[in-house]
Structures are given as C-alpha cells and as structure tokens.
Amino acid sequence: MNADGSNVRQITNVDGYDGGPFFSPDNKWIIFRSDRKKEHMLQLFAIDVNGKHEVQLTDNLNQVNWCPYFHPSGKYLIWSGADYSRGPSSAHFNLFTMEINYSDAGFKGGDITQITFDSRADVLPVFSPDGKKLMWTSTRSEDKTSQLWIADWLRGK
C-alpha cells in the first residue's frame, strides 16, 4: 500500500462478512473468519494471497469460530470457538486447534481438537514468536474480568 492509501486490491468478494485475517508464517496464505454460510455463525477459511484458491476449514453452522492464528511452525492453527446451538447465553468460548498442511499447491486442514474446557470465555489466542508459549484472554479469574493467561505450548515445536 502506498502512503496515500492507494495500490490495494480486494481478495474476497462474497455475500456476508469476511474479516480477522492473519498471514501464514511463509506469507503465502491468509486465514480468516466468515459468516457467508449462515449469518453470525463464523466459520474459518484459508485463501492464498492472490485470492485464487480458497478452502473452508470449519463447517459447523451452530458454532462461532473466530480469531484464528497460525503457530510460527506453520503446523497448527488455533482459534476461539463456541457452540451456539442452544443460544448465545449458553455458549462458552474455548480454544481449539487444527493440524494443517499447506504449500503453493493447496491448503489442507486436519482434525479439530478442543484444548480448553472452561465455562467462562477463553478468547484471542496468540503464540509467542518462537512458538513455545500460548497466550490468551480469559474471564476465568475469580472476579470474572478479562485477564491475560499464558501456558507452555508443548506441541508443534
């Protein structure tokens, strides 16, 4: 992008919301959330930086998935997700991971694993630049306010 805001291009063009993009460690893919399948029920997608190849990674229309983030190794995605099948008041955001494999030729997601199981919100996960720490925001503190939490990441080194 130029300093004046020119020289930009759109890479998605579908009905609904597309947002929350993050680059892969090799800068060739972007992960993002979208409600194009069902309004407000965010699913995760990957698209190459040219906008030519797109892959849907989650497909549960009762689940809200947001804040996807790459592990620096490029082997995992992490995100916040909540089951909305019984309505928003009973939905609890927890953290989920997916092993991934990608190259210039394509992007493939694997099995989804839930890694936190709290009745309060675990959201906005990020990895340290060396991939050894996981940090997120949670309301699991005694006073239920949003606070920062950290843990060693023991997979995907």
List each language-model region with its residue ranges.
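Sequence signature of WD/YWTD-type beta-propeller architectures
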Residues: 1-157
